[in-house]
């Protein structure tokens, strides 16, 4: 690996002042021996000058975990809750999440994201999420980057990404007009389904030329965009960089 990670122009490596502004929730929470949440709280309190004990107590009512129980005896979902509890109590400027809700039940997932979004709204916290769950990201992120083999293949606002690709379902007896950029095409009965790249208004105008009896333009989910734009073993970069 190579390169340098910077936050606000400052290198992160061996920079305690910058690291104190960052909290990370890993895929698996590391704890030594019989360490408890209370032990970890004391540890975090010394690492993070802005650690908020009042916030810690408030979140304790939400997560309702036993502070005196060894973390290694918690289930994965309970360990994940403990990680959120500790990290959010640090009042970080930057919150880094790795597969953040893996192991949590649907109710707790919603609760956790609600807490994170409240911090974003109230404190301006920037959240960086690494996840394979695109459906989850679509609900909480406003900017998306897709990496493959360590390279950033696509980085764009979610709105811009969704504006650039459209699903069309239509019924027509005439051939499709020229000038359409078709990423995928299928047919079930008389209904054709097209995945098209381009502006929705331009696509609608072109499809109108074949006088369809039915024509619906639908937004795609982030997962669908990923499949149609980056599908295939090697992810054809030429299809997404323009």
Regions found by a protein language model. Give the residues of each.
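Conserved ABC transporter NBD signature motif
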Residues: 2-18
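ABC nucleotide-binding domain signature
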Residues: 20-26, 145
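ABC-family P-loop ATPase nucleotide-binding domains
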Residues: 26-82
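Catalytic Walker B motif of ABC-type/P-loop ATPase nucleotide-binding domains
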Residues: 95-99
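Helix N-cap at the start of a conserved alpha-helix in ABC-type nucleotide-binding domains
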Residues: 106-108
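ABC transporter nucleotide-binding domain
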Residues: 111-200
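C-terminal coupling/interaction segments
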Residues: 195-242
């Amino acid at each position: 690996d190579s390169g340098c990670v910077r936050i606000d122009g400052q290198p992160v490596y061996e920079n305690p002042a910058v690291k104190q502004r960052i909290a990370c929730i890993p895929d698996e929470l590391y704890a030594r021996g019989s360490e408890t949440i209370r032990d970890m709280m004391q540890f975090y309190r010394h690492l993070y000058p802005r650690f908020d004990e009042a916030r810690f107590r408030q979140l304790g009512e939400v997560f309702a975990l036993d502070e005196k129980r060894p973390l290694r005896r918690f289930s994965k979902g309970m360990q994940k809750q403990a990680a959120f509890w500790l990290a959010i109590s640090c009042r970080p400027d930057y919150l880094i999440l790795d597969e953040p809700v893996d192991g949590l039940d649907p109710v707790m997932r919603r609760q956790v994201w609600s807490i994170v979004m409240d911090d974003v709204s109230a404190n301006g916290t920037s959240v960086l999420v690494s996840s394979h769950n695109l459906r989850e990201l679509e609900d909480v992120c406003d900017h998306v980057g897709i990496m493959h083999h360590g390279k950033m293949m696509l980085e764009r606002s979610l709105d811009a990404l969704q504006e650039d690709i459209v699903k069309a379902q239509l019924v027509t007896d005439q051939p499709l007009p020229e000038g359409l950029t078709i990423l995928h095409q299928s047919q079930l009965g008389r209904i054709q389904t097209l995945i098209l790249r381009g502006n929705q208004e331009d696509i609608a105008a072109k499809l109108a030329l074949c006088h369809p009896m039915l024509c619906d333009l639908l937004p795609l989910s982030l997962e669908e965009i990923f499949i149609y734009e980056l599908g295939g073993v090697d992810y054809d970069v030429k299809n997404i960089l323009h």
